[in-house]
UniProtKB/Swiss-Prot annotation:
Name of the protein in its database record: Photosystem I assembly protein Ycf4
Function of the molecule: Seems to be required for the assembly of the photosystem I complex.
A biological process from GO: photosynthesis
Native species: Prochlorococcus marinus (strain SARG / CCMP1375 / SS120)
Principal subcellular localization: membrane
Length: 193
């Protein structure tokens, strides 16, 4: 779940001037499993609905032709269509690797470049490194937990730079935040709720 760091190497000492952080996108095992389950379930519900409408068994399991079309077969058809559309959407996100990208801290140019793949186009944000005041770790526990690394910027909202998904382990989050703060020579702000 953690982002991979790599320091560029060239004849000059670029580890002091360039830091790249690769951010993983939507190509995760859990997304493949959910998209596959939705596809199978959606097709199954649609076939059960068609079986109840035409009175023939289109599924090898059960006996869906005995279902009354209104309301059981009709609702199964709606659920099947909805699940199939959501599955197609998830497969599209997986195909383009939505959310993947690169955080590139370049001291030579004095620019932080944050690039992410969107559904239809790539998003690129460039910020002067001098505008970065601190690296901030945000941790929120509870029903909807959030663990992420953000950059506190001068005159702007905080910019999240860690990957989206399940919460990262705290140790990994702290190590990544410390690596960035050390590279930028700024403060690492604590865990805020």
């Amino acid at each position: 779940m953690s982002a991979d760091f790599k320091e560029a190497s060239s004849p000059t000492d670029s580890s002091e001037t360039l830091l790249e952080q690769i951010v993983k996108g939507s190509r995760k095992t859990s997304n493949y499993i959910v998209a596959s389950m939705l596809a199978v379930g959606g097709i199954g519900f649609s076939l059960a609905s068609l079986s109840s409408y035409f009175g023939i068994d289109l599924l090898p399991l059960g006996n869906p032709s005995t279902l009354i079309f209104v309301p059981q077969g009709l609702f199964m058809g709606f659920y099947g269509i909805a699940a199939t559309f959501i599955s197609v959407y998830l497969w599209a996100l997986i195909k383009v690797d939505y959310g993947s990208g690169l955080n590139r801290f370049d001291k030579n140019k004095g620019v932080l470049s944050v690039s992410r793949k969107g559904l239809l186009k790539e998003i690129l944000v460039e910020i002067p490194i001098d505008d970065i005041q601190a690296v901030k770790l945000e941790v929120r526990e509870g029903f909807n937990p959030r663990r992420r690394i953000t950059l506190r910027l001068q005159g702007r909202r905080d910019l999240p730079i860690s990957e989206v998904g399940g919460p990262q382990p705290l140790l990994s989050l702290e190590q990544e935040g410390a690596e960035i703060a050390r590279f930028l020579k700024v403060n690492l702000e604590g865990l805020s709720n």
